[in-house]
């Protein structure tokens, strides 16, 4: 995993109800990313539950996702249990 390779940390942002990973790429590490500090936002079961609750609270007609197929299969269990 990219975050582990660069000794990053994963935290859950309570304001956005989403996890994020923060990691730094140094010049001495090989890879496609240029040197710098990166913040990577993603979804997990906890963040999906929060978003589903929000959609239900406001009676929204559905949910959307970007780039289906990159998620962990367990994510769908969370979606189906909560909709």
Curated annotation (Swiss-Prot):
SUPFAM superfamilies: (Trans)glycosidases. InterPro entries: Glyco_hydro18_cat, Glycoside_hydrolase_SF. This is Probably inactive glycosylase YkzR. Belongs to the glycosyl hydrolase 18 family. Residues 1-83 form the GH18 domain. GO terms for biological process: carbohydrate metabolic process.
């Amino acid at each position: 995993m990219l975050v582990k390779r660069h000794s990053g940390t994963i935290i859950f942002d309570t304001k956005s109800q989403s996890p994020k990973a923060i990691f730094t790429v140094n010049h001495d590490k090989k890879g496609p990313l240029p040197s710098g500090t990166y913040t990577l936002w993603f979804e997990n079961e906890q963040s999906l539950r929060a978003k589903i609750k929000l959609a239900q609270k406001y009676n929204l007609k559905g949910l959307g996702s970007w780039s289906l197929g990159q998620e962990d299969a367990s994510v769908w269990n969370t979606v189906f249990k909560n909709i």
